[in-house]
Structure formats: C-alpha cells, structure tokens
Amino acid sequence: MSIGLRAVIITLVVAGGFGCSKDGSSSETKEVSITEAKGACADIHKSQVCTWAKMQGENVLEVGATVPIGSIENAPADTTMVWPPVPVAALDIPDVARQKSGMTNLTMFWEAQGHPTGAFFTPHFDFHFNGISSAEINAIDCKDLTKPTALPAGYALPDFDLPPDASKMMGVKTMIGLCVPKMGMHAVPTVDIERKEPITASMVVGYAIGKPIFVEPMISKALLMKKESFDLTMPAVSGWTGAQASKFRAEYDAQKQEYRLIFSDFSAAN
C-alpha cells in the first residue's frame, strides 16, 4: 500500500469518527422536547378550569388556561353584586413559567350583568392574567389614584361617574381610571369606549399606582357560546415587568368541548 493511499484511508476513518457517536447516532444537538407544565385547577360552574404552560426546555412557548364550555354554559344568570367583586377562581400559573412569561396567576370573574362602561354592560367573563402576587392584588385599595405616564397605542383610561345607588355601595362618586379595589385601574381600547353596541371581546390592560399589573381578555358569554376560535390583538405595554406576550388566541376544541386561552410569542424579560 502506498503512503498516499494510506493517508487517504486514515483521513476518512478519522472524519467518520467525528460524524457519529459511539451508538451510531448523529453528534448534532438533538431538538429539545416540548412539554406542558400543569398549574392550578378550580371547579367553576360544575367544570374544572386549569392553568398551564407549554415549555421547550427553559423557554416559555405558551401560557394559558383551559376553560370547559360547561363553566360558561352553567354560569348563573343572576348574581348578587358585591363590592369589591370576588373572583370565581384564583389560580397560580406554573412556577416554571412565571418569570419568563411575566404572569403569576389568573383571577377569573363572572359578570352576570356586566359593569361600567356602557358597552361592557353585557354578561361576560374577565380573565385577569396578573403579573403580581395574590397578596399584592388584595392590597390594592384605589386610594393612590396615580395614572400611568403612558398607555398602549389606541388605549384610554377613562373616569366613570357612578349613579347614586352604585356610588353609595362603592363609596365613591367617580371611578377614577375605572379603578376597582383588589383589581386596579382598567385601560381599554378607545374603540370599545366609544362603542354603542355591547362588546364581544376586548383586551384590557390593568394598572396600580401607575404601573401595569395585568392583561385581561374580557369575553362576552355570547361569543364564548358560539364555540369558535378567535384572536385578540395584544398591545405593547410600556413598563411591564418581565416578558410580554405578543399574541392571544382563544382556541376551541369541539371534541373536548373546551377553550384554551393561549398567550404566546413572549419577548425577553425586562
């Protein structure tokens, strides 16, 4: 065998050794599998609503909640109004996703008669995806009415003059920035403030002492009962602590008879 041929054979053998591992598999990095972390669940109107997070390694792909249609269908038509409102559920987001999603917990409200302003006086659900702890939420008393210096494009933070009966119950004549104790202020799209007919769905942004603290898909019962998937535009929220989702979709599964409320496309945490 010539020296030149021997060199070629050695080169090919060595190169082949770098291309395969001992078990014959490629040495290229394998794709990290996608997993779903389970959060908390609660019985709401005879059905279980649960939070979850879809992860790929340490990266958050989606955060959301599973909402069975039974929890919508069985919502009572008449409820006694209390102040401040009490959530039908308070559910933690999975630990693994909190920091990288900017979301800590979900508080869900059933508004049988709706609430201010005009277009929101229709039966609907409020899904508050909060970026602060439950203790911080419960400490909100609407005494410091500092408004944020900047709002998302196309949003407003209106004040609402209350009728006498509501004013007596709430203890104020005007809801500054639509501030609700144990919730915060509510910034809403200006098109929904000006709307004459009842809303079907809206993406609300919440504030406390000038800082953003939640994003809220506000969705009418009528829309949810259509059992159809839909999207809502996510605003860019200045001052939000942590990552922000740039997409929201309510995806209906006819076979499972449930919605998945999905936040996705998260930015890097601030």
Where are these regions (language model features)?
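Beta-strand-enriched cores of mature, soluble protein domains
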Residues: 108-113, 125-130, 244-246
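Short N-terminal edge-element motif at the start of the domain
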Residues: 31, 41-44, 57-123
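Bacterial N-terminal signal peptides that target proteins for export
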Residues: 1-8
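Phosphate/adenylate-binding glycine loop and adjacent helical scaffold
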Residues: 32-33, 45-53
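Intrinsically disordered, flexible peripheral segments
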Residues: 42-44, 53-75, 134-138, 142-270
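Non-catalytic accessory regions used for complex assembly or targeting
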Residues: 28-36, 40, 116, 255-262
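Bacterial Sec-dependent N-terminal signal peptides
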Residues: 11-35
